[in-house]
Amino acid sequence: MSHEAPTYAEVDPFDLPEWLGECRVTWDAERGLSTGHRVTGALAADGHDPLPCDLLAVDDAYPEPVAADAIRVRAHQVWRHGEVMIAEDHGRMLLVVPGSRVDTETALEAIARLARAVGAPSGSYAVLLEVRF
C-alpha cells in the first residue's frame, strides 16, 4: 500500500457548498479529540450529504513534520487575523489550526471561524464531541 503525501491545497470559502451558510450545521468528530494532530469528522445538515471535514493541528513535528513550513506559516497568519485556513487533502476538507494537538477550545473556535467564513448566522453551527476515558 503506497502512502500519498498530503496536499493541503487551500480552498476559498466561496467554493464550498452553499448549504454551509444557509442551514443548521453540526460538525461531528468521528473518534474524539485525543486522536493526535488530525481529528477526522464531518459537517452535516438535514437534507444534505455529510461533508468530510477534519481538523489539522499543523505544528506537530514528531516523528516528522505534519506540513511544510509554508503551510504552517499560512495557518498561523490566517488564525492570527481571526480566520481559519481551509484546505483540501485527497478529497477531505481540512480546517488547519495552530498547535500540535486539537483541544476542545480550538475545535470550537475553528468551527466558529468556518461558520463566519461561509456567512452562516450566529448560532447555526454546533459541535458534537464524544466523552472518552
Predicted regions, residues:
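Well-ordered alpha/beta subsegment
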Residues: 91-112, 123-133
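Charge-rich, low-complexity N-terminal segments
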Residues: 1-44, 87-88
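Short, well-structured hydrophobic secondary-structure segments
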Residues: 35-61
